[in-house]
């Protein structure tokens, strides 16, 4: 049957990408349908029970700045919060939280069920329908056809998923869930370029069988950090500790003894695994000189004894899993509740996507999450929000939301995917960004909230909070610039106490705060330095960073401005690179293969040299007919 309602946007998949995509589209006022094979698993944390970290936490803050759900759900479910790299530069500071799986899933479902313009329906999708080269809807397992003007596909690891434990394997999207075999086959029929990737998960351990007296405790931070600008510490559930143990030479010998039955080493697994989150057998093989690896025991929630041993993801046979777990200190009597496993799945070459995450070959079809070759909840969620928003913009005939590399880590992520592609699961790091001093956790709202508000992603309450913060920062910076001190105004001992030396000339608070050995709190101990208004910790942090890093930020802005023409100059559809004088055959081939949308994207394709970019610029600026 054909369902009687036609939707603006259909989202397929209820994981982190799918839920953010559906919420984004519905927030923008589009009639949206979220299809999932099981409503009970909406927003499920399939692997580790944590959100954030270096690079990933930056993405979560960017999601939040655009009205996304992940940060707020984490505040409602987080059972341990830590600020990583707190003693380092502002660019690499990041927030990480352990989340209660049940509370996180409940928070996401509550948001979905209370979101206007959003319908939920429980059915696996087996086919997509086309009107020529344009998407027109989807067909579910029981034959219901849903019509839509745009479709966002967020299938995660479910497309032709295969689970491996030792030499045994079976079809599945994750443990306990079926694979999307029919949909995977249908997408292959559409000639979308695809490949296979792999990820994995560790065995879960019953906390009642862990000897915590032999482990090192890792408590959370005090005061407890907050993830969302809409959240607060009062939202947080009870806070608990993580624990640390280590592998040893016995553990490594046990792991090596299972190599002959490992699907990774016997060729059973075709997909490439994540370089920066390798399985324990891969670690032991690649780093044979290391006698020990640190393992974090992370609680899965407040109402369960289950622990997640972060660092021993494995697809080794179950007897090896038992032995390797029990070889570690504190786990000698550990009972495994669920075995570890590897899963390989289809992904589609993201170089076939536009910067909006719409496919280049099928109009109105958007991809987000692991289907694009990424790994991680945060990477998936960020893509989901962008794809959902751009699906609405497509339906409305409006320009897509495109984020630049110097504007957001999400901009870096998408640009990397569509220009370089992937040959292993892509994970976000701060080192991937050229302008990471601009892309801090603390200023995600300053970078993105206004853009989100303009297209309807950000609600009025969040917009009001943002403006109050932005105005408070501007007022305080201006006050610092107009509050002056002279050597004569301050007692000599007061100067030495605050500045570490005597003032040599008149200075304002703004210039004094730029000194590397002086922070805002110390400066405010000067007589007459305190502001009349009560400033939040977030405003003070923003003021201090903006003042101290102003010189570096100004230099980066000059560099960004110098590249602006290259980054934004559009390459015409159907441009004939053979008519660009001086381009080598290799560069022509790469440009024809990748079909970049801008000169900036072209410049980041492997093999496209600066000289080739210069030739492109000359060609476009001359205004040849084929480039108009």
UniProtKB/Swiss-Prot annotation:
Entry cofactors: FAD
Pfam families, alphabetized: GIDA, GIDA_C_1st, SAM_GIDA_C
Positions contributing to NAD(+) binding: 273-287
PROSITE patterns in UniProt: GIDA_1, GIDA_2
Subcellular location, record wording: Cytoplasm
GO cellular component: cytosol
Residue stretches in coiled coil: none
One example GO MF annotation: flavin adenine dinucleotide binding
Keyword Cytoplasm carried by entry: yes
Superkingdom: Bacteria
Record carries keyword NADP: no
Binding locations of FAD: 13-18
Subunit structure: Homodimer. Heterotetramer of two MnmE and two MnmG subunits.
HAMAP family: MnmG_GidA
Function (record text): NAD-binding protein involved in the addition of a carboxymethylaminomethyl (cmnm) group at the wobble position (U34) of certain tRNAs, forming tRNA-cmnm(5)s(2)U34.
Protein name (database record): tRNA uridine 5-carboxymethylaminomethyl modification enzyme MnmG
Gene: mnmG
């Amino acid at each position: 049957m054909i369902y009687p309602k036609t939707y603006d946007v259909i989202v397929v998949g209820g994981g982190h990408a799918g839920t953010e995509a559906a919420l984004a589209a519905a927030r923008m006022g589009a009639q949206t349908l979220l299809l999932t094979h099981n409503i009970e698993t909406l927003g499920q944390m399939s692997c580790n029970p944590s959100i954030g970290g270096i690079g990933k936490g930056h993405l979560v803050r960017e999601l939040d700045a655009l009205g996304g759900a992940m940060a707020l759900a984490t505040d409602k479910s987080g059972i341990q919060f830590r600020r990583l790299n707190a003693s380092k530069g502002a660019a690499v500071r990041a927030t990480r939280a352990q989340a209660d799986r049940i509370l996180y899933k409940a928070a996401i479902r509550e948001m979905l069920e209370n979101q206007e313009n959003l319908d939920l329906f429980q059915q696996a999708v087996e086919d997509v329908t086309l009107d020529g080269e344009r998407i027109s809807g989807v067909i579910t397992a029981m034959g219901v056809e849903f019509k839509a003007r745009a479709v966002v596909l967020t299938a995660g690891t479910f497309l032709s998923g295969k689970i491996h434990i030792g030499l045994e394997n079976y079809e599945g999207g994750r443990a306990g869930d079926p694979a999307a075999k029919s949909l995977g086959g249908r997408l292959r029929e559409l000639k979308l370029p695809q490949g296979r990737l792999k990820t994995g998960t560790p065995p879960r351990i019953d906390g009642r069988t862990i000897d915590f007296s032999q482990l090192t405790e890792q408590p959370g931070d005090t005061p407890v950090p907050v993830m969302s600008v809409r959240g607060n510490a009062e939202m947080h559930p009870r806070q608990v500790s993580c624990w640390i143990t280590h592998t040893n030479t016995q553990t490594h010998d046990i792991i090596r003894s299972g190599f002959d039955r490992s699907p990774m080493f016997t060729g059973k697994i075709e997909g490439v695994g994540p370089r920066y989150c390798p399985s324990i057998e891969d670690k032991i093989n690649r780093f044979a000189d290391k006698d020990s690896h640190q393992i974090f025991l992370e609680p899965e929630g407040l109402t369960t004894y289950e622990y997640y041993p972060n660092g021993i993801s494995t697809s080794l046979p179950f007897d090896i899993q038992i032995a390797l777990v029990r070889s570690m200190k504190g786990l000698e009597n550990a009972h495994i509740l669920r075995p570890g496993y590897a899963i390989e799945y289809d992904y589609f070459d993201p170089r076939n996507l536009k910067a909006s995450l719409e496919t280049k070959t099928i109009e109105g079809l958007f991809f987000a999450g692991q289907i694009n070759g990424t790994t991680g909840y945060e990477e998936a969620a960020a893509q989901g929000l962008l794809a959902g928003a751009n699906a609405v913009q497509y339906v409305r005939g409006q320009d897509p939301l495109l984020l630049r590399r110097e504007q957001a880590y999400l901009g870096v992520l998408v640009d990397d995917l569509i220009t370089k592609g992937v040959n292993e699961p892509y994970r976000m790091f701060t080192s991937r960004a050229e302008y990471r001093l601009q892309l801090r956790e603390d200023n995600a709202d300053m970078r993105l909230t206004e853009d989100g508000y303009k297209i309807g992603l950000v609600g009025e309450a969040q917009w009001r909070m943002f403006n109050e913060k932005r105005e408070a920062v501007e007022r305080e910076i201006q006050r610092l610039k107009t509050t002056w001190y002279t050597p004569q105004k301050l007692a000599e001992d007061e100067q030495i106490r605050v500045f570490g030396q005597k003032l040599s000339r008149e200075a304002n608070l703004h210039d004094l705060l730029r000194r590397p050995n002086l922070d805002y709190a110390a400066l405010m101990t000067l007589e007459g330095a305190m502001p009349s208004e009560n400033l939040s910790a977030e405003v003070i942090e923003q003021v201090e960073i903006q003042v101290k890093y102003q010189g570096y930020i100004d230099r980066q802005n000059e560099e960004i401005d110098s590249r602006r023409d290259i980054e934004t100059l559009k390459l015409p559809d159907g441009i004939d690179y053979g008519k660009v004088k001086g381009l080598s055959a290799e560069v022509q081939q790469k440009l024809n293969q990748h079909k970049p949308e801008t000169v900036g994207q072209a410049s980041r394709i492997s093999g496209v040299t600066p000289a080739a970019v210069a030739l492109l610029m000359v060609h476009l600026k001359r205004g040849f007919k084929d480039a108009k």
